[in-house]
Swiss-Prot record:
It comes from the Bacteria. It catalyses: an acyl phosphate + H2O = a carboxylate + phosphate + H(+). InterPro entries: Acylphosphatase, Acylphosphatase-like_dom, Acylphosphatase-like_dom_sf, Acylphosphatase_CS. It is an enzyme of class 3 (hydrolase). Belongs to the acylphosphatase family. It holds the Pfam family Acylphosphatase. This is Acylphosphatase. It comes from Lactococcus lactis subsp. lactis (strain IL1403). Its EC number is 3.6.1.7.
Length: 97
């Protein structure tokens, strides 16, 4: 199982970015959670058995690749810090409130 934690900076809150992340993750079969942090960043925990899908998902989050021709229309990602992570397995991908 491949698991990562991403901290996404830029204009990523209040612009539908978390919903874009959810749609993109579900299309790729990625499981995990996404939420807003108090410092204006968005945090993502993502897991999959397929390393290539995780790389594709990371590229979509960074804005380097579109998800089925879509990019997050109002978000402006300026930085993504990604690192391997250890967390309990998820069975879906949703927003954590």
């Amino acid at each position: 199982m491949f698991k990562v934690k991403m901290i996404v900076s830029g204009r990523v809150q209040g612009v539908g970015f978390r919903y874009f992340v959810i749609i993109s993750a579900r299309e790729l079969g990625i499981l995990g959670r996404v939420w807003n942090n108090d410092d204006g960043t968005v945090e993502i925990l993502a897991q999959t058995e397929d390393e290539k899908k995780l790389e594709e998902f990371t590229a979509i989050v960074r804005g380097e690749k579109s998800s089925k021709g879509r990019l997050s229309p109002f978000a402006k990602v300026t930085d993504v810090k990604s690192s391997p992570a250890n967390f309990p397995d998820f069975t879906d991908f949703n927003i954590k409130y």
